[in-house]
């Protein structure tokens, strides 16, 4: 382990910047004080005298991964780091998450950088603990003000909201220039959510009802869809500027309790829809729903990337959804790239992830907020 703000020099690495698909071979990357200080051909300049040198011959330096949909638990923090994830977006805020975030930021606890939305704003009956019920649209203003007071920068909208409550939450959010994201409530069409300016849609929620031939199947409406509806929905999504975090891998697990043919259709049709999002240029984020029972925190991100490639994305575009594009969504300049001035959230790999997405699993080490953890140091981190 080498702790920030010390200088660290990675020598003779192949750099995957994520700015484009091109790689830079035989580079020296110097990080200091949590930032990337320089990227130069190895040997072109003397190394900083105070730098710890990490030899990277035959290795690839890429941005650390960003899991854009987690439900954060303290016990899981090491699992994210072991998987090369240095940043997470927590998708249900509550006091325990606020405490974890504070402890990580103060240095009291080691974990990924945490971005979080508010408590879920939902109607009755609530599905999860720490729900803020908004059964009366007139209560939306108060509910949103409570979330602001609690320090949450964005709102989470959820499944059981009435159309009226959803619209009232949207209006309260817009008065504050505040993002809202999450599910498309059952009472709201996906087109209405897009027109309302929902910033991200999780799990392709709402699209299922718009494309299915079998209403009333909930999330598993994907078993029987009309693909001729995909194109226009995606066009409208791009027009609205809404991002999608499709959480593909968890549906591979959740669909196991369906018939074999329905399961195969659910997986295939979700892949087809994601392929259309990518083909038209809609914005995609890689997220796992980690913290939900069927998903393993950390390792599930590699499953998610594999699923995005199975949907037809190139390894580069799949990886962008977990690096550069995620950083753009989070509005952190440079995050998810290997560029000068960017946050030093980097992963050293024993293979090129643009050649095969499976290489994201071959982790030789990770920098988190500018501190370096070798594979051995990561392996030694406590796990549940």
Put a short name on every predicted segment:
Residues 264-349:
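His/Asp/Glu-enriched, well-ordered alpha-helical/loop segment
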Residues 2, 15-28, 41-42, 296, ...:
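Acidic, glycine-enriched loop/beta-strand segments at the rims
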Residues 56-61, 72, 76-192, 196-257:
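Divalent-metal coordination cores built from histidine and acidic residues
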Residues 3-38, 55-68, 72:
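Mature N-terminal segment immediately following signal peptide/propeptide cleavage
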Residues 42-47, 69, 380-381:
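A short acidic/small-residue loop/turn micro-motif
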Residues 190-198, 211-214, 250-260, 270, ...:
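Histidine/acidic-residue-rich catalytic or RNA/ligand-binding cores of hydrolases
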Residues 13, 29, 34, 58, ...:
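Divalent metal-coordination and catalytic microenvironments
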Residues 1-8, 12, 372-384:
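Extracellular/periplasmic ectodomains of large secreted or surface enzymes and adhesion receptors
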């Amino acid at each position: 382990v080498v702790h920030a703000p010390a200088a660290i020099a990675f020598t003779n690495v192949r750099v995957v910047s994520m700015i484009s698909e091109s790689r830079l071979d035989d580079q020296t990357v110097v990080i200091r004080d949590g930032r990337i200080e320089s990227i130069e051909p190895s040997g072109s300049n003397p190394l900083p005298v105070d730098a710890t040198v990490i030899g990277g011959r035959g290795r690839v330096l890429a941005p650390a991964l960003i899991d854009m949909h987690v439900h954060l638990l303290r016990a899981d923090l090491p699992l994210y780091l072991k998987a090369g994830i240095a940043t997470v977006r927590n998708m249900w805020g509550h006091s325990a998450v606020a405490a974890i975030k504070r402890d990580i930021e103060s240095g009291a606890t080691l974990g990924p950088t945490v971005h979080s939305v508010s408590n879920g704003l939902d109607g009755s009956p609530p599905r999860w603990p720490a729900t803020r019920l908004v059964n009366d649209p007139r209560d939306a203003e108060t509910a949103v003000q409570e979330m602001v007071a609690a320090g949450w920068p964005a709102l989470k909208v959820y499944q059981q909201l009435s159309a009226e409550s959803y619209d009232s939450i949207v209006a309260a959010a817009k008065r504050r220039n505040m993002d809202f994201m999450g599910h498309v409530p059952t009472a709201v069409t996906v087109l209405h959510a897009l027109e309302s300016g929902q910033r991200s849609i999780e799990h392709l929620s709402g699209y299922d009802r718009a494309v299915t031939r079998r209403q009333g199947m909930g999330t598993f409406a994907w078993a029987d869809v009309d693909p001729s509806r995909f194109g226009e929905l995606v066009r409208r999504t791009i027009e609205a500027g809404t991002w999608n975090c499709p959480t593909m891998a968890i549906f591979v697990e959740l669909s196991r309790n369906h018939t074999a043919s329905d399961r195969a259709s659910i997986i295939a049709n979700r892949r087809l829809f994601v392929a259309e999002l990518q083909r038209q240029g809609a914005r995609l984020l890689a997220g796992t729903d980690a913290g939900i029972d069927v998903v393993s925190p950390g390792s599930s991100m590699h499953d998610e990337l594999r699923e995005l490639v199975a949907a037809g994305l190139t390894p580069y575009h799949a990886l962008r959804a977990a690096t550069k594009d995620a950083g753009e969504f989070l509005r952190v300049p440079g995050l998810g790239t290997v560029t000068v001035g960017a946050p030093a959230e980097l992963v050293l790999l024993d293979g090129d992830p643009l050649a095969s997405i499976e290489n994201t699993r071959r982790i030789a080490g990770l920098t988190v907020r500018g501190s370096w953890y070798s594979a051995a140091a990561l392996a030694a981190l406590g796990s549940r």
